[in-house]
């Protein structure tokens, strides 16, 4: 009976070790595929339009800020008939970024205090 128990433990150990190695191989393959996809995406990415620059030709080309993508906002200037479009950050997103930044700084202070 002891022999069967010892053999069973050895079998389970070998099985778990081999499955762990297989999972590591799969994870490495997934990482390699993901990196190649990211490189392809970066290669085909076009230049973004900075904040407050004209985005009338491509309204989806605005750059990202720290957390959110800027939005192409169009308006008619006072006394003008031509529509003007610029990349801008909506105020509510601006306030959310400020709050997130302050929370991050406060979290760093708490971490520093309590080590």
Swiss-Prot record:
InterPro entries: Spider_toxin_CSTX_knottin (IPR019553), Spider_toxin_CSTX_Knottin_CS (IPR011142). Expressed by the venom gland. Keywords: Disulfide bond, Knottin, Secreted, Signal, Toxin. One of its GO terms (cellular component) is extracellular region. Its main location: secreted. Residues 1-20 form the signal peptide. It is found in: Secreted. Residues 21-44 form a propeptide. Disulfide bonds join 48-63, 55-72, 62-87, 74-85. It comes from the Eukaryota. GO terms for molecular function: toxin activity. Pfam families: Toxin_35 (PF10530). The keyword Secreted applies. The keyword Signal applies. The presence of a 'disulfide through disulfide knot' structurally defines this protein as a knottin. Belongs to the neurotoxin 19 (CSTX) family. 01 subfamily. This is U3-lycotoxin-Ls1b. It comes from Lycosa singoriensis (Wolf spider). The lineage of its organism: Eukaryota, Metazoa, Ecdysozoa, Arthropoda, Chelicerata.
């Amino acid at each position: 009976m002891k022999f069967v128990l010892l053999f069973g433990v050895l079998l389970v150990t070998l099985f778990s070790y081999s499955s762990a190695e297989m999972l590591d191989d799969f994870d490495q393959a997934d990482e390699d595929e993901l990196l190649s996809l990211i490189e392809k995406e970066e290669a085909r990415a076009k230049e973004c339009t900075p904040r407050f620059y004209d985005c009338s030709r491509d309204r989806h080309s605005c750059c990202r800020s720290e957390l959110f993508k800027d939005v192409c906002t169009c308006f008619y200037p006072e006394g003008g008939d031509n529509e003007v479009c610029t990349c801008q950050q909506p105020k509510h997103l601006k306030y959310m970024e400020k709050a997130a930044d302050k929370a991050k700084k406060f979290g760093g202070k708490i971490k520093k205090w309590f080590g």
